[in-house]
Amino acid sequence: MLTRKQRDLLEFIHKRMQRDGVPPSFDEMKEALDLRSKSGIHRLITALEERGFIRRLAHRARAIEIVKMPDAMTGGGFEPRVIDGDRGPAPANAMAVRAAPAREVPVMGQIAAGVPIEAISQVASHVAVPEQMLGAGGNHYALEVKGDSMIDAGINDGDIVVIEEGNTADNGDIVVALVEDHEATLKRLRRKGGMIALEAANPAYETRVFRDDQVKVQGKLVGLIRTY
């Protein structure tokens, strides 16, 4: 039996992962549940983990996987948004993931979630991505994340991010940004006037601000694949 707050938090995490492909940050959870501090979120997360509804991924800051949903909340079906690789036996109460149609997406190399690295434009391999994550239409590619600047957005070093190709993005979108035509980075984009801010999701990294003509959007985040 879950409390109302526990159910509300679980539902919020589930909806955000369905929409964005990554878990919300603790600040976003706190705001969504109208709590005064993140300590309340920590207590709710711990309670959900103890009851087997979620799992916090070891050695990955604030990375959360939904293991199951309450029966009353699964009328439309439920599948975890984090795609698991080889990791040994699953917990006894873990739900089996149903096979879903998938599409091969090219992995274009590595992208920095930290200090920008040289832009990558060659296909390194391919990865199978559920069509549900890709949606209808559009071109997609994938990149391996290097660095920890986006950990508070649930994006960790070694994750594979799935990107919808395009040169436009809304304020607050997580994008692949090409800086001065030679460095690529994964950051949250903010526009103000003729300037663009590339925000990290880790307080250890500073926000970098550029003129509009120094940054080109190469695509926006639509999902995430994690193996561990």
From Swiss-Prot:
Pfam families membership: LexA_DNA_bind, Peptidase_S24
Catalytic activity reported: Hydrolysis of Ala-|-Gly bond in repressor LexA
Classification via Gene3D superfamilies: Umud Fragment, subunit A, Winged helix-like DNA-binding domain superfamily/Winged helix DNA-binding domain
GO biological process: DNA repair; DNA replication; negative regulation of DNA-templated transcription; proteolysis; SOS response
InterPro entries the UniProt entry points to: LexA (IPR006200), LexA-like (IPR039418), LexA/Signal_pep-like_sf (IPR036286), LexA_DNA-bd_dom (IPR006199), LexA_repressor (IPR050077), Peptidase_S24_LexA (IPR006197), Peptidase_S24_S26A/B/C (IPR015927), WH-like_DNA-bd_sf (IPR036388)
GO molecular function: DNA binding; serine-type endopeptidase activity
UniProt DNA-binding residue ranges: 26-46
Superkingdom field: Bacteria
Site (Cleavage): 113-114
Keywords, comma-separated and alphabetical: Autocatalytic cleavage, DNA damage, DNA repair, DNA replication, DNA-binding, Hydrolase, Repressor, SOS response, Transcription, Transcription regulation
Active site annotation, chain numbering: 149, 187
Enzyme nomenclature, EC number: 3.4.21.88
EC primary class: hydrolase
Oligomer and partners: Homodimer.
Family as reported in the entry's similarity comment: Belongs to the peptidase S24 family.
NCBIfam families: lexA
Record's function text: Represses a number of genes involved in the response to DNA damage (SOS response), including recA and lexA. In the presence of single-stranded DNA, RecA interacts with LexA causing an autocatalytic cleavage which disrupts the DNA-binding part of LexA, leading to derepression of the SOS regulon and eventually DNA repair.
Name of the protein: LexA repressor
